[in-house]
């Protein structure tokens, strides 16, 4: 990719930075300069994230020396230990900086784990009086991943040794506390891998560093409580994550680095299990925790399920899988571009992308015909759910699912046997001396002739699923064909249900007419059945075969491949996401209204009270000394925050010199909301009602936003997130190539953006040419364009009316934003990535280059991220607004990456395959379940191109698609109104799909969703609090006054009878209709009895003797 492209992006960034700096210099914001530092590479990103000078230069030196990321992380630790970095720091500070910097390097300087996941380090005393090192981990360490978590402990040990600190020597009680605590955490939260009790004991007994942590859960341990060296009885999530997902799971990686660096004291790793990998084969894990309304599409490896097809389309890879748009339609439109599916293999989940060039579903129509639907336009009724129910009686086969080799490589999953598809046949035909061009579809006679003349297997179009039937069924079908009539190339047989069922299992397309089964183009079928004009040519006892596939190979005299040896089970996960990011309730401005703002937090309502008392930041003017909360004083000077110790009252910028606690500028003061709002409206020349603020501020200093920004946001209907920015969330989908018509951008506009030639080197002239996507360009949902247009109008008003500058965007329609710069940001991270908008699609997803997603440390298995206009972030983001609580700095652009270097993105992108064709040797390797690493040399991967010009361009793909946004616009999970409607559709679909056991689905829905919900609601009703309808205050017990002590408002229950009964009736009905187990029915009956006894009067009516007469 040309340097001109990156220079163009950076030139646009410099232009917007200049405007933002001019605006910020007016002193109307917490700081007088833009608060998002720019980073050009990983080294600079790490340094700016951890704020330690000299780190970037040292990382670059390690890169020159050729050190891997892990080796560099340990070398950084040595630098801190030996004083080359962090000069003048205390022992604990040096250790703290070493661990944070190492974790930042291991996570590409993107995630918040280094600053949020490591709370602090400390020293403790062993029983022998020696000091040991404690590292306090917090919940956000999860975002670092297991390898970084484990290596952080190794770095801590490395630095500990250099500083002469003794190893940790736990007591037996402390060891058992870890065993109990990790087990309890597993019940409360998800763990990728749960070590056995003995493995936990081994880790804690031998780890030379004490893995400590902050309490993250409300639950407390019940056994090993009040231990002298353990500061809390509550569950510490950090210790469970680092011990289980870190050390236990990533043992082989730690061991490798321990051996390479010659660090002693870690030999105990050999007795751990760790790195548990699924060894292939069928697994039903994806069916766990089934949710009502989210259908199962196929049980594990079941005939009729998705057939595995290897390859990558231009909109798949990086965990996204391709499915024919017709399949999406046929499945009651539960699947749409971006919908997450939980899959059997190769990974745990995938996002769905439409690929029209793979096979669609095979269905039985209500008239008995069996057809395959590859093109939805051929069956106009397919887009209507009602018409689907009228026209389809059974979904016999779901069609193909396109999975790339790179996804098997990334998951280290043995290659599953490939389906026999055209691209495999083409490679065999090419090796035999033929030219496969134009032969993707051939008739039966041609298929037989090519097979005989060239000695290649029968063409996939006429290779049926013989492995799905038994020898008895083969015998039955041969008899029926022999008794039938051959009319030219067609076969006519008497209509018999058992014969038709065998044909359906084979996926033989046929019609039912006048009591006859009609198979057109039947010559290959007859050849495989050993039937000709004279009838059947074989007897069962003559066969030397133990299965039908082997038998048809003998009977036909041709090579017949297994058409679909691998089926992939799957169910629906999360629906696709395309929506604005909102806090709850959504505010226009981070300005406190207190209880005076009412339950809607309206600034206008608070202003009616005149003065209100709230906690805000105390600021002082350096010129005139006046104190208040405004950023600019009436005299025109920019004010300064005044921090003081909340305990001692001593004023200090960071920590109290007397007691050492962190200072804050947050002060309870009376503020004139009425006057402030009136001045804001007057200065802007606006009159806006219903400006939503917040109840209170959660940042360290309780810093409020200028009220003028809220006025303008309310005017344009724009809402704000916790850091001052306005965001739009979208499901991630990959895209390496596109057609101009797919993104709604004209050829002229694309030429202006630098898209001058297509992938074949031809000048761009038509909107149907395929172009290679530049790595920092993105294509968004059209709804996102509408939202960004509103934000752009707010920004222009802000520049003109608040900052006194010229408007920047001047946009009247979403297309006017094409070419504008934005920031992409993933949850749990702290580094935004610069990007450019080039178009819109109808799909509810965000398309971007795999590098762009990987730069945010995301893949495309259903993850969702946000985008924001660059100018919005530069003007409105401030660290001063971020919540002070743990995790407050996550999901905030603390640093901005301006140029993507493929070597510095998440390594999953390095396994993206770029070939136009998979070689024949690859398909043959799948038949022996080869390890992906054994065939890595056959496939062109990103990892092989790093450091060359080819790392940015010249990407290939094996399968094209007509439209990257094909299929339904939204999943019906989002469009169906009630949960009952969703579940009804889910169970109807289960009955319709051959690969699904509807009874099992019904049982799983009841057991994993409805029963826990019923029990939880029943428990919640008995423990509920009461709520004030006026101020929303909640009370654990109803006050004796029967009204709100705060405002006198009416109190109501927070859990109602309807909430408890919600799923009872439907659960009983489903249990009866689908014949679930008696155990499940009895559980429902017991809960029904409990609910009835709770809500029905149990008073006994007094009866007399006369009542019985």
UniProtKB/Swiss-Prot annotation:
A GO biological-process term: DNA-templated DNA replication
Lineage: superkingdom: Archaea
Disulfide topology: none
Compositionally biased residues, Basic and acidic residues: 573-585
Single annotated GO MF: DNA-directed DNA polymerase activity
Alphabetic keyword roster: DNA replication, DNA-binding, DNA-directed DNA polymerase, Exonuclease, Hydrolase, Multifunctional enzyme, Nuclease, Nucleotidyltransferase, Transferase
Region listing for Disordered, in residue ranges: 571-597
InterPro entries for this protein: PolC_DP2, PolC_DP2_cat_dom, PolC_DP2_central_dom, PolC_DP2_N, Znf-DPOE
Keyword Secreted: no
Reactions accelerated catalytically: DNA(n) + a 2'-deoxyribonucleoside 5'-triphosphate = DNA(n+1) + diphosphate; Exonucleolytic cleavage in the 3'- to 5'-direction to yield nucleoside 5'-phosphates
This enzyme's EC code(s): 2.7.7.7, 3.1.11.1
Keyword GTP-binding belongs to the record: no
Annotated function: Possesses two activities: a DNA synthesis (polymerase) and an exonucleolytic activity that degrades single-stranded DNA in the 3'- to 5'-direction. Has a template-primer preference which is characteristic of a replicative DNA polymerase.
Family, similarity comment: Belongs to the archaeal DNA polymerase II family.
NCBIfam families: polC, PRK04023.1
Assembly behavior: Heterodimer of a large subunit and a small subunit.
Protein name from the UniProt record: DNA polymerase II large subunit
Annotated gene: polC
């Amino acid at each position: 990719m040309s340097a001109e492209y990156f220079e163009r992006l950076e030139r646009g960034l410099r232009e917007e930075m200049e405007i933002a700096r001019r605006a910020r210099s007016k002193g109307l914001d917490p700081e007088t300069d833009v608060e998002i530092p720019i980073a050009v590479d990983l080294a600079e990103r790490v340094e700016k994230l951890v704020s330690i000078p000299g780190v970037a230069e040292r990382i670059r030196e390690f890169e020159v020396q050729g050190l891997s990321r892990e080796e560099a992380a340990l070398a950084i630790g040595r630098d801190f230990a030996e004083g080359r970095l962090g000069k003048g720091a205390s022992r604990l500070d040096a250790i703290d900086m070493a661990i944070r910097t190492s974790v930042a390097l291991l996570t590409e300087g993107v995630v918040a784990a280094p600053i949020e996941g490591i709370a602090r380090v400390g020293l403790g005393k062993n029983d022998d009086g020696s000091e040991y090192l404690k590292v306090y981990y917090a919940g956000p360490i999860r975002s670092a991943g297991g390898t970084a978590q484990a290596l952080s402990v190794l770095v801590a040990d490395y630095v500990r040794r250099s500083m002469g600190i003794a190893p940790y020597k736990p007591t037996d009680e402390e060891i058992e506390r870890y065993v109990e605590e990790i087990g309890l955490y597993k019940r409360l939260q998800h763990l990728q891998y749960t070590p056995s009790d003995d493995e936990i004991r081994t880790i804690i007994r031998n780890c030379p560093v004490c893995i400590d942590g902050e309490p993250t859960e409300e639950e407390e341990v019940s056994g090993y409580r009040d231990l002298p060296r353990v500061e809390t009885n509550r569950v510490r999530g950090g210790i469970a994550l680092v011990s289980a997902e870190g050390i236990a799971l990533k043992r082989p990686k730690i061991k490798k680095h321990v051996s390479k660096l010659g660090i002693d004291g870690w030999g105990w790793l050999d007795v751990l299990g760790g790195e548990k990998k699924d060894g292939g084969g069928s697994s039903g894990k994806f069916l766990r925790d089934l949710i009502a309304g989210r259908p199962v599409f196929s049980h594990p490896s079941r005939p009729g399920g998705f057939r595995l097809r290897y390859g990558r389309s231009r909109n798949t890879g990086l965990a996204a899988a391709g499915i024919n748009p017709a399949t999406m339609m046929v499945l009651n439109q539960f699947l749409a571009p971006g919908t997450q599916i939980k899959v059997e293999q190769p990974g745990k989940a995938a996002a769905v992308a439409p690929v029209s060039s793979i096979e669609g579903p095979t269905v039985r129509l209500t008239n008995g015909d069996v057809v395959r639907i590859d093109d939805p336009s051929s069956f106009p009724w397919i887009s209507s759910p009602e018409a689907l129910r009228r026209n389809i009686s059974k979904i016999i086969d779901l069609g193909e699912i396109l999975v790339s080799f790179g996804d098997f490589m990334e998951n280290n999953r043995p290659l599953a046997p490939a389906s026999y598809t055209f691209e495999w046949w083409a490679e065999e035909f090419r090796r035999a001396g033929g030219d496969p061009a134009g032969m993707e579809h051939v008739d039966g006679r041609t298929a037989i002739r090519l097979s005989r003349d060239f000695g290649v297997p029968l063409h996939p179009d006429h290779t049926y699923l013989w492995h799905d039937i038994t020898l008895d069924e083969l015998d039955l079908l041969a008899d029926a064909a022999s008794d039938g009539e051959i009319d030219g190339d067609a076969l006519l047989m008497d209509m018999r249900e058992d014969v038709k069922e065998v044909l359906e299992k084979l996926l033989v397309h046929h019609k039912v007419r006048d009591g006859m089964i009609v198979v057109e183009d039947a010559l290959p079928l007859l050849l495989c059945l050993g039937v000709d004009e004279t009838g059947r040519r074989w007897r069962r006892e003559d066969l030397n075969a133990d299965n039908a596939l082997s038998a048809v190979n003998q009977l036909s005299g041709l090579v017949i491949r297994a058409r679909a040896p691998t089926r992939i089970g799957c169910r629906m996960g999360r629906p696709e996401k395309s929506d604005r990011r909102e806090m709850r309730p959504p505010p226009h401005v981070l300005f406190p209204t207190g209880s005076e703002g009412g339950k809607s937090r309206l600034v206008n309502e608070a202003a009616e009270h005149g003065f209100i008392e709230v906690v805000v930041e105390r600021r002082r003017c350096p010129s005139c000394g006046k104190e208040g909360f405004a950023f600019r004083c009436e005299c025109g000077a920019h004010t300064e925050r005044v921090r003081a110790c909340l305990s001692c009252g001593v004023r200090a910028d960071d920590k109290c010199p007397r007691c050492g606690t962190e200072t804050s500028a947050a002060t309870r003061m009376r503020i004139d909301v009425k006057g402030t709002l009136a001045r804001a409206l007057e200065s802007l020349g606006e009159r806006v009602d219903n400006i939503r603020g917040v109840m209170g501020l959660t940042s360290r200093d309780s810093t409020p936003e200028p009220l003028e920004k809220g006025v303008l946001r309310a005017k344009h209907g724009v809402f704000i997130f916790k850091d001052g920015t306005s965001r739009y969330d979208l499901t991630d989908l990959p895209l390496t190539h596109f057609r101009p018509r797919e993104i709604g951008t004209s050829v002229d506009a694309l030429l202006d953006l630098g898209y001058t030639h297509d992938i074949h080197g031809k000048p761009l002239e038509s909107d149907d040419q395929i172009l290679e996507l530049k790595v920092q360009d993105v294509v968004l949902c059209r709804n996102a364009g509408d939202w960004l247009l509103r934000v752009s109008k707010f920004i222009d008003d802000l520049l003109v009316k608040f900052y006194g500058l010229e408007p920047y965007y001047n946009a009247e329609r979403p297309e006017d934003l094409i070419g504008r710069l934005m920031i992409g940001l993933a949850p749990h991270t702290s580094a935004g990535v610069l990007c450019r908008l080039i178009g819109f699609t109808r799909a509810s997803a965000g398309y971007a280059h795999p590098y762009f997603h990987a730069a945010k440390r995301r893949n495309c298995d259903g993850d969702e991220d946000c985008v924001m206009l660059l100018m919005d972030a530069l003007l409105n983001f401030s660290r001063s607004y971020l919540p002070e609580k743990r995790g407050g700095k996550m999901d905030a652009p603390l640093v901005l990456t301006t140029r993507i270097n493929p070597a510095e993105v998440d390594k999953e992108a390095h396994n993206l395959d770029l070939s136009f064709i998979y070689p024949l040797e690859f398909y043959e390797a799948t038949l022996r379940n080869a390890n992906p690493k054994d065939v890595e040399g056959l496939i062109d991967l990103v990892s092989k191109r790093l450091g060359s010009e080819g790392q940015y361009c010249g990407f290939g793909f094996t399968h094209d698609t007509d439209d990257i946004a094909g299929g339904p616009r939204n999943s019906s999970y989002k469009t169906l109104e009630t949960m009952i409607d969703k579940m009804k559709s889910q169970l109807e679909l289960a009955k319709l799909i051959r690969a699904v056991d509807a009874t099992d689905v019904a049982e799983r829905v009841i057991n994993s969703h409805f029963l826990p919900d019923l029990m939880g609601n029943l428990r919640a009703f008995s423990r509920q609090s009461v709520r004030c309808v006026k101020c929303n205050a909640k009370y654990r017990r109803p006050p004796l006054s029967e009204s709100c002590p705060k405002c006198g408002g009416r109190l109501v229950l927070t859990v109602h009878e309807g909430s408890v009964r919600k799923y009872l009736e439907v659960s009983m009905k489903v249990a009866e209709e689908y014949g679930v187990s008696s155990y499940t029915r009895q559980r429902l009956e017991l809960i029904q009895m409990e609910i009835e006894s709770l809500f029905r009067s149990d008073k006994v009516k007094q009866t007399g003797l006369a009542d019985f007469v």
